[in-house]
A protein has these predicted regions:
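Short aromatic/hydrophobic "clamp" motif used to bind/position activated sugar donors
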Residues: 45
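Conserved nucleotide-sugar donor-binding
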Residues: 41-42, 85-98
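Acidic donor-binding segment of Leloir-type glycosyltransferases
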Residues: 1-24
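Glycine-rich, basic loop-to-helix element that forms the pyrophosphate-binding segment
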Residues: 23-40
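Donor nucleotide-sugar recognition loop
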Residues: 95-116, 127
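Conserved donor NDP-sugar-binding/catalytic core segment of glycosyltransferases
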Residues: 59-85
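The conserved acidic donor/metal-binding loop of glycosyltransferases
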Residues: 49-53
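C-terminal catalytic/acceptor-binding lobe
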Residues: 112-191
Length: 191
């Protein structure tokens, strides 16, 4: 394991705490984030995707913000694609909001839904704009989702036009399983 070999010095110093599980069999983004935040011991928790890294001064900046303000959460600028999953908030707010919704499986949307619930609970969304905090390791999109259930098990996808606002979706999985549903654009449909 790379982490045990490369980061043992920091693990032994207590700077890095490392947890690993072999369950579930496929990567589940919402579940992994919930587990990390539940295992965290600090008052302020931050999610940072594995392909991201922060610049010097980020922790100090966040601690100052959370010491001086109440009922807030920080995200990166949501216009930048590769840093979308970042969020910092007080651990108690995470627990009270019940974490990420684990119904969301696959890539994306779990962040948006979680941020929306925080806003509905009266928290204020702040955005850190310092360019030194926007560091990412560049890689192909395929690497981003390589361990996800859909990529490992999906065999075919069929789309059936219903009307300008609705499309029926049939997903065939390996092992003779399938999923079916309708994608509907409610906003466009109501105009």
């Amino acid at each position: 394991e790379w982490i045990a070999q490369s980061m043992m010095k920091y693990i032994e110093m207590g700077i890095l705490v490392y947890y690993r599980t072999t369950e579930p069999a496929y990567y589940r983004r919402s579940h992994s984030r919930n587990m990390v935040f539940r295992l965290a011991e600090g008052e302020v928790v931050c999610n940072l995707d594995a392909d991201n890294y922060l610049g010097r001064g980020f922790a100090e900046f966040m601690l100052k913000e959370f010491n001086n303000k109440e009922r807030l959460f920080y995200t990166s600028n949501l216009c930048y694609r590769d840093v979308f999953g970042r969020v910092c908030l007080e651990r108690k707010e995470f627990v009270e909001a019940r974490g990420y919704n684990e119904v969301f499986v696959g890539y994306g949307l779990e962040d948006v839904e979680f941020f929306n619930r925080l806003l509905c609970r009266g928290l204020v969304q702040e955005i850190f704009n310092q360019k030194e905090f926007y560091n990412v390791l560049m890689h192909a999109d395929e690497e981003r989702i390589a361990q996800e259930f859909l990529l490992k098990k999906l065999q075919s996808v069929y789309l059936d036009y219903i009307n300008p606002y609705s499309t029926r979706v049939l997903m065939l999985y390996k092992g003779q399983r399938f999923g079916i549903g309708v994608i509907q654009n409610n906003i466009a449909m109501n105009y």
